[in-house]
Structures are given as C-alpha cells and as structure tokens.
Amino acid sequence: NELSETYNVSRVTVRKALAGLSELGYLYRKSGKGTFVAEKKIQRGITNGVLSFTDMCRMMNASPGAKITKIALEDPTEKEMELMSLDKDEKILVLERIRYADGKPVQLELNKFPESFSFLFSENLNDSSLYEILKKHNIILDHSQKTLDIVFATSKEAKALGISSGYPLLRIESVIHDVDNTITNLCRQLCIGDKFKFII
C-alpha cells in the first residue's frame, strides 16, 4: 500500500517490481515478516587470473579491509618446499589475515611466501592490498591454479568470522605465479559462501 501510494502506481505493478528485484537478488522475502533489502555480495570469478580482494570490493563499491592475525617465519612442509623450490634450511613467511567488506568479516586469508619475502614484516598489512604492496617491490602476480571445496568452520574460524561453528565455507586454494611463471606464494581463502557471488 505504502509503495503504491508513494509512487502512484497500482499494487500489481509494485508486486511485479518486488518480484523482479527478488529474482535479481536485490531483495529477499521472509514468510510472515515481509520483504527486505538483500546484503550486497562480492562478485568474484573462478578463473586462472589473479584479482585482489581489494579490487573485487572496489568493483562492487564496497570498502575493503584487512586485519593481521599472524605473521611469522615457519618451517615449510615437504610439499611446500617442493612447490616453491625452497632450499633445505629455508623458512616460509606465513601471513594470516581477516578480510572485511564494508566493515564486516567475509573471508579468512592465509598466504605462504618464500623467506625472501621477509620485507613484508616492515609493511603495513592492515587495511592494505597485499598485491599493491608486492607490486611496489616489482613483484607482479599474473596467474594461478585454483582448487575449490566446501569445508565447515572450526570454532576458531567461526569466532574470527562472526558465524556459528560448523557453518559451511568455500575453501579456495591457489598456487600463484608471477609474470615470469615463478611461484610467488600459496594462498588459502575461507569464504562465507552467502557473502560472495561466484562467476564461473
């Protein structure tokens, strides 16, 4: 009634408009409660290209954010040593961050780099684009191989993301290469599925 009177259109027209917006994902209905505006989803393509979280948010007019939860040098696994062609005594730099869109946590991000990337210790990695920082050091990320599966949030992951334990997450694991086809880092992302719209 209110929309019909405000815009001087028939109820049928209003119902059709609301149905159309619901189909497009802009609105959602709750039985017995009404129609509500849907939360904006971050669009990301599942390709072998490399697109930063920051750029994805900017494309959606969302404000990107990041908070470091861990940065340390650790011993690599045998698989990591082999993938990144590491020397026997070489460490890896482990960087864990929570990623935010418009101030809300939407993704956990784990990156592993060769020890030569230790310059990251002196960079401000909170609310910053990692890819832009790497570019500043003449490291241009170019392509990746990705694997995807569904996992369920541990209590620690759930607490970081503000969701319930056991909540389904999309896990994306990537092997990322630079323009010279050298592996720069291994990346694991745990995404809250209903915060993203994936394009294949």
Please give the residue ranges for each predicted region:
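All-alpha effector-binding/dimerization core of bacterial HTH-type transcriptional repressors
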Residues: E39-I200
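N-terminal helix-turn-helix
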Residues: N1-V37
